[in-house]
């Protein structure tokens, strides 16, 4: 399976409430690494998931992956990933503002 299919699979798992399985699918999408768009979506999902579950170190790792590539993503993908980029920046700002991360 390619990364895009793992993202689709994760979306279906989320709709069924199978969040742990969705996390596994998103991790597989990242491991495959053949699609920047799918990897960005997976990192965003995982960053948000870990943030909600108060695992701020893991959240930061995934969200910083997006933030570090923001210019490249904006140049290559136009506005396709704006939501993911905005969410990553917002959550990183929140973690910094409330001293949730070092």
Report residues per predicted region:
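Alpha-helical segment of the N-proximal tetratricopeptide repeat
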Residues: 2-24
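TPR/TPR-like (Sel1-like) alpha-helical repeat modules
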Residues: 51-75, 90-93
